[in-house]
A protein has these predicted regions:
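Single conserved hydrophobic/aromatic residue that forms the stacking wall/gate
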Residues: 1-8, 12
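Switch II (G3) loop of P-loop NTPases
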Residues: 5-6, 18-44
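Short glycine-/polar-rich loops that comprise or flank the Walker A/P-loop
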Residues: 8, 51-56, 80-85
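Inter-motif core of Ras-like GTPase G domains
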Residues: 22-28, 44-64
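Conserved beta-strand segments of the P-loop GTPase G domain that flank and frequently precede/overlap
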Residues: 33-34, 57-61, 87-89
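Glycine-rich phosphate-binding loops of nucleotide-dependent enzymes
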Residues: 36, 49, 162-165
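Active-site glycine- and acidic-residue-rich loops that bind
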Residues: 62-69, 103
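C-terminal lobe/tail of nucleotide-utilizing enzymes
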Residues: 74-173
């Protein structure tokens, strides 16, 4: 029977989350971002229980299939007392010779924003559209945050400014 082992896995995931949140010294963070896989929302529910003031940022890509899943993930806010702060669209475009190429289509983030706003009864804004940048992957694989230069300063190029704008929106009350 598959159900008992799935349930046990959920228990271990929740315990791991609780240990992660309690054993790591966070200082006084302004924002703590947890990257949760889309799906049933079990982890989002666990986060809401462990962090009562948690808010949700839904991340999608432009494709309709991805935005449909993102809407379902955002609707977990109806099950728990969690506000959806906004939507981020990842891999929105690839810039080549000054032209923005929409490799994966367009509009997924806006669709998610509109559908969640309608379903939840409040504005769920599209907070950022992040470009597809091979350099971000390379920097991540090297173990460095993609928003920082080699010297540790915040990047001042397009991706740095995009992330700065997103951070400012997340910190705004």
């Amino acid at each position: 029977d598959v159900a008992p082992s799935r349930g046990l896995g959920d228990v271990y995931k929740r315990q791991s989350l609780e240990q992660f949140l309690s054993d790591v010294w966070w200082g006084e963070p302004d924002v703590l971002l947890l990257d949760l896989a889309p799906g049933t929302g079990d982890m989002a529910i666990s986060v809401a229980q462990a962090l009562p003031n948690a808010e949700l940022v839904v991340v999608t890509t432009p494709q309709p299939s991805a935005s449909d899943i993102a809407v379902r993930s955002g609707l977990v806010a109806l099950q728990v007392p969690m506000k959806v702060r906004g939507v981020v669209e990842n891999m929105s475009y690839y810039e080549h010779k000054g032209e923005k190429l929409e490799i994966f289509g367009a509009g997924g983030g806006q669709r998610v924003s509109e559908q969640l706003s309608a379903a939840l009864g409040y504005d769920v804004p599209l907070m950022a559209q992040l470009p597809l940048e091979p350099e971000v992957r390379e920097i991540g694989e090297a173990g460095r945050p993609a928003v920082l230069d080699v010297d540790g300063a915040l990047r001042t190029d397009g991706i740095g400014q995009t992330f700065r704008g997103l951070a400012e929106r997340l910190l705004a009350v």
